[in-house]
A protein has these predicted regions:
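Multi-pass membrane proteins that catalyze or facilitate reactions on polyprenyl-/lipid-phosphate substrates
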Residues: 1-155
Length: 155
């Protein structure tokens, strides 16, 4: 992969990560448009590095909020911060389990399969449209909600 392709994909990742769209799906489309012919393992490594960079930049931007939440969590008392971190951890479980046990199958299924990636982006768009039209109850996220969010993210 040329450095210019890497730069373009890095910019694409940076723009789409914080939008309610699949940045991973857009990366796959971007790789296809740029004619990326790298091996699946190299492609996956590149995607992981981009996501790591995004996570690192997010930590830098939200460092004060993260510090406050961690400070509350480290008091070892059941409070709003410990509940928040518990819900985040619970929401990560489905993706972690699927990623650990089905990594190769997922890479074969989605890696370079632009038609499937495009179809999944359309499905995601429809779900976001329906969620936007749903009645807003302003309720707090429950543990069940956190788990369902994790399943949705894993899919």
């Amino acid at each position: 992969m040329e450095w210019t392709d890497s730069l373009i994909l890095g910019i694409l990742q940076g723009i789409t990560e914080f939008l309610p769209v699949s940045s991973s799906g857009h990366l796959e489309l971007g790789k296809a448009i740029l004619g990326d012919n790298s091996m699946p393992e190299e492609s996956m490594l590149f995607t992981v590095v981009l996501h790591f960079a995004t996570a690192l930049s997010t930590i830098v931007v939200f460092r004060k909020d993260i510090r406050d939440i961690l400070t509350g969590f480290l008091k070892f008392k059941w409070n709003e911060d410990t509940q928040f971190i518990s819900k985040i951890a619970l929401s990560m479980l489905p993706a972690a389990v699927i990623g650990l046990f089905f990594e190769e199958e997922l890479e074969q299924l989605f890696g370079g399969n632009i038609v499937l990636v495009g179809f999944m982006l359309i499905i995601t768009g429809l779900l976001l449209f329906l969620a936007d039209r749903a009645k807003n109850t302003n309720k707090k996220v429950s543990y069940i909600d956190a788990f369902v969010i994790g399943i949705s993210q894993a899919i």
